[in-house]
Design a protein with these regions (language model features):
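Catalytic and substrate-binding clefts that recognize carbohydrates or anionic sugar/phosphate headgroups
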Residues: 60-211, 221-222, 234-239
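Short, Gly/Pro- and small/polar-rich lid/capping loops
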Residues: 2-8
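Flexible loop/turn segments at secondary-structure boundaries
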Residues: 30-31, 38-39, 146, 153-156, ...
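A low-complexity, Ser/Thr/Gly/Pro-enriched, surface-exposed linker/loop concept
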Residues: 25-63
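Aromatic-lined carbohydrate-binding/catalytic grooves of carbohydrate-active enzymes
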Residues: 208-333
């Protein structure tokens, strides 16, 4: 797994004008472009480790091009140009690889109809085949895949950076130094999918196994339950000898985040609705200690945090110390 060292070995880095290439493995190259020459060495939401053993590679400038060649890939970059171009026959940047004896050429923006796909953020309103919702994944029958750290996800979210806390606290979310920069990882593993996934964990971190209980029986229903309702449900399930592992407490556990009311009219909220759950700590303790149940609170954070929340002042004070643009009326981003 990754060792959380976001700084690549200098021997793996090749700079050319506004471009920076990092040869991470024989099959993986990081590609950056920054008009401001502000390249990122901080960890991101996706990549936490770039300090890998430097693979064998050569670099050469010839006839106006930079060539980087590993045991598996040949990268060609037209010196002094923006890497994304409309000339598919002679792109400014291309990578060539062998896929089962067939030469495959990639360039920025090339579409991949053979990608084996990844995930989707939500299954809300899912009925039947939802493959068109899926984002591109790490594996493809075409033999290559790209992790584009600058491309917004389908829900509009971005991969941001982590600013290291030098005082022993928690690293904090930060914008990129150059918000217009390009930053992508080319993975040319052919059909060696196992190696592709293995090398991905070297840069992204080890994938933890879920605890066994999450594969058990969950009780979850979108209904305006009270604490007593949920105690009654647990007791009835137990009385029927139905094994249960997780109890989901749906969104009415919290107050209306904007107004502080307990009417259940607001999806976003962070403070317990004492009209329905008069003793939250006691209830959670009863679930954990007496019923041996795990629990989770259904949360919809999209609208942010408003001053009616119980701990708003403390949260605001902490964030205001980190960011100068925090507004006192709400924390919505």
């Amino acid at each position: 797994g990754a060792q959380d060292n976001s700084m690549a070995d200098e021997k793996a880095i090749v700079k050319s004008g506004n471009m920076r290439f990092t040869v991470l493995t024989p099959e993986m190259i990081r590609i950056e472009y920054s008009a401001k020459l502000q390249f990122e060495d901080r960890a991101s939401f996706v990549v936490i480790n770039r300090h890998l053993p430097v693979p064998n590679f050569t670099q050469e400038e010839r006839d106006g091009y930079l060539y980087l060649t590993t045991d598996k890939l040949e990268l060609r970059y037209k010196l002094g140009t923006y890497p994304v171009s409309n000339d598919r026959c002679n792109p400014n940047l291309q990578i060539t690889l062998d896929v089962n004896g067939v030469e495959e050429v990639w360039y920025p923006g090339k579409q991949d109809p053979y990608n084996l796909k990844g995930t989707t953020r939500t299954l809300d309103r899912a009925e039947g085949d939802v493959r068109e919702w899926l984002e591109n994944g790490l594996l493809s029958r075409v033999g290559w895949a790209v992790i584009d750290e600058r491309e917004p996800r389908k829900d509009g979210s971005l991969s941001l950076m982590f600013e290291r806390d030098t005082n022993g606290g928690m690293d904090w979310v930060a914008q990129r130094k150059d918000t217009a920069a390009l930053d992508m990882y080319f993975m040319g593993y052919g059909h060696d999918y196992k190696k592709a996934l293995g090398d991905f964990t070297k840069i992204a971190g080890k994938i933890p196994l879920p605890p066994l209980y999450v594969f058990g029986y969950w009780y979850s229903k979108f209904q305006r339950y009270t604490e007593q309702d949920m105690r009654d449900i647990v007791n009835e399930i137990r009385s029927r000898d139905i094994p249960m592992d997780v109890l989901v407490i749906d969104m009415d556990w919290h107050r209306n985040g904007k107004t502080g009311s307990t009417d259940g009219t607001e999806w976003t909220g962070w403070s317990w609705n004492k009209a329905l759950f008069p003793d939250p700590a006691g209830f959670i303790s009863w679930l954990h200690d007496e019923q041996n149940l795990n629990t989770t609170l259904n949360l919809h954070p999209a609208d942010g945090v408003f001053p009616k929340e119980d701990n708003y002042d403390a949260l605001y004070a902490d964030l205001a110390g980190r960011y100068s643009d925090i507004k006192a009326d709400s924390l919505t981003n």
